[in-house]
């Protein structure tokens, strides 16, 4: 449902800054803005910028640069005016209040993006990518969101939809002319459904990798008690995140810290020291440590250079592992021939941490996105709907093999198209739209 009113909001985050932006969109955006600006906004051409003074009730608010983008050549598809004023809280707030006093309505979270979607400027997948771009915490999450916003995900979904529509058209012909001998034509919809299934499966298979790239690679620090795992976590992140004492078994639970290394996100996981114990609480912590090791993508096995070398757990041989010798400022570690990279550090002095960061960086850059157009799913909503599409296509393919009635096959394909419609936004409900855009910031 298209909106008829004019909305306004501050588009920049609160606080000190060189520039703040107030955005207005809607049928009366130009006339409302014109009433508070010293220049003649109504006479300005689209996509031009003009310097002037914002005045309301004969009071000068601020000098501002005004940008005009006329319908339909704007982000929302409506007339848009943006006021670029001095940063800080008061100038932009007073400009917004003036716009509201002249008839604009305060925008809801994500309402500008929602209008762009409703006016056909972007689809729902691209709209969701805007929030992902804003909230990206590392360079991979940014590239994934950028690819989605540029339409690469939408193109893949559109390909699936086109193949299903072609298959459905063949099936409807078969249903309309059952007396005709066109059995050989049944291979055509099977081919289209198979192609659609292949693309769908590729997208579904990208979900775990997309989640890892967007959320960060999980690296667990594990080892015997008092080896210095918590000290290493604190040293790497440069935070006093974990409690450090000389008492073995201080860490009883999993402690996770996000850390960005050269644009890549790591989830560093500190864990309880692994040993035999009768303490019930410590036992639970050790079990969680083992679970963290099994679920992590890499292990930093921390050893005390001054202590005897214990037997290594089997899981170290099954995952990317670095053998991290700590406390090398007070003891020399033994010479071992093991299939792991060995790094010698001191959490106390900082020795060896440059080499450790280089090794971790090498791990992280095994997947390079850069300007690649590869599509990764990261949204649970997208994954759920595509899984429904996959189920419907699989059922349709099975139905062909079992010679089910064409009406049953057509029903499966229509259900698949319905899920795709929910994905792209062509059939989405207002409740779903409200839930999606409510997560956006105001002014976007």
From Swiss-Prot:
Its cofactor is K(+). GO terms for biological process: tRNA methylation; tRNA wobble uridine modification. Gene3D superfamilies: P-loop containing nucleotide triphosphate hydrolases (3.40.50.300), Probable tRNA modification gtpase trme, domain 1 (3.30.1360.120), tRNA modification GTPase MnmE domain 2 (1.20.120.430). Its main location: cytoplasm. K(+) binds at residues 226, 245, 247, 250. InterPro entries: G_TrmE, GTP-bd, GTP-bd_TrmE_N, GTPase_MnmE, MnmE_dom2, MnmE_helical, P-loop_NTPase, Small_GTP-bd. Belongs to the TRAFAC class TrmE-Era-EngA-EngB-Septin-like GTPase superfamily. TrmE GTPase family. Homodimer. Heterotetramer of two MnmE and two MnmG subunits. This is tRNA modification GTPase MnmE. It comes from Chlamydia muridarum (strain MoPn / Nigg).
């Amino acid at each position: 449902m298209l909106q008829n009113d004019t909305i306004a909001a501050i588009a920049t985050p609160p606080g000190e800054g060189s520039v703040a932006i107030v955005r207005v969109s809607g049928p009366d955006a130009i006339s409302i803005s014109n009433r508070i600006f010293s220049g003649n906004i109504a006479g300005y051409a689209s996509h031009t910028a003009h310097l002037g003074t914002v005045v309301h009730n004969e009071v000068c608010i601020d000098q501002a640069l005004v940008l005009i983008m006329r319908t339909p050549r704007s982000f929302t598809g409506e007339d848009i005016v943006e006021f670029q004023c001095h940063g800080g809280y008061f100038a932009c707030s007073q400009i917004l209040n003036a716009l509201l006093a002249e008839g604009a309505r305060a925008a809801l979270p994500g309402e500008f993006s929602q209008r762009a979607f409703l006016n056909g400027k972007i689809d729902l997948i691209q709209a969701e990518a805007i929030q992902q771009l804003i909230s990206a915490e590392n360079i991979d999450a940014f590239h994934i969101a950028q690819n989605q916003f540029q339409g690469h995900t939408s193109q893949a979904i559109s390909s699936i939809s086109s193949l299903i529509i072609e298959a459905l058209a063949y099936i409807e012909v078969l249903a309309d002319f059952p007396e005709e001998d066109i059995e050989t034509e049944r291979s055509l919809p099977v081919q289209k459904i198979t192609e659609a299934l292949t693309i769908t499966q590729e997208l579904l298979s990208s979900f775990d990798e997309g989640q890892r790239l967007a959320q960060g690679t999980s690296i667990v620090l594990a080892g015997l008690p008092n080896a210095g795992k918590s000290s290493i976590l604190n040293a790497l992140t440069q935070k006093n995140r974990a409690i450090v004492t000389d008492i073995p078994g201080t860490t009883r639970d999993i402690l996770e810290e996000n850390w960005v290394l050269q644009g890549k996100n790591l989830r560093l996981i500190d864990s309880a020291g692994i040993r035999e114990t009768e303490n019930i609480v410590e036992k639970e912590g050790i079990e969680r440590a083992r679970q963290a090791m099994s679920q992590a993508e890499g292990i930093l096995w921390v050893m005390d250079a001054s202590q005897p070398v214990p037997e290594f757990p089997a899981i170290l041989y099954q995952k990317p592992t670095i053998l991290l010798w700590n406390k090398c400022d007070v003891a020399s570690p033994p010479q071992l021939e093991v299939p792991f990279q060995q790094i010698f550090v001191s959490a106390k002095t900082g020795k060896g941490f440059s080499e450790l960061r280089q090794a971790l960086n090498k791990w992280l850059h095994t997947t390079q996105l850069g300007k690649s157009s590869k599509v990764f799913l990261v949204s649970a909503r997208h994954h759920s709907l595509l899984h429904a599409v996959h189920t419907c296509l699989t059922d349709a393919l099975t139905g062909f093999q079992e010679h089910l009635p064409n009406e049953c096959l057509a029903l499966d394909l229509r259900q698949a198209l319905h899920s795709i419609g929910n994905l792209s936004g062509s059939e989405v409900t207002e409740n779903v739209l409200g839930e999606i855009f409510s997560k956006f910031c105001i002014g976007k």
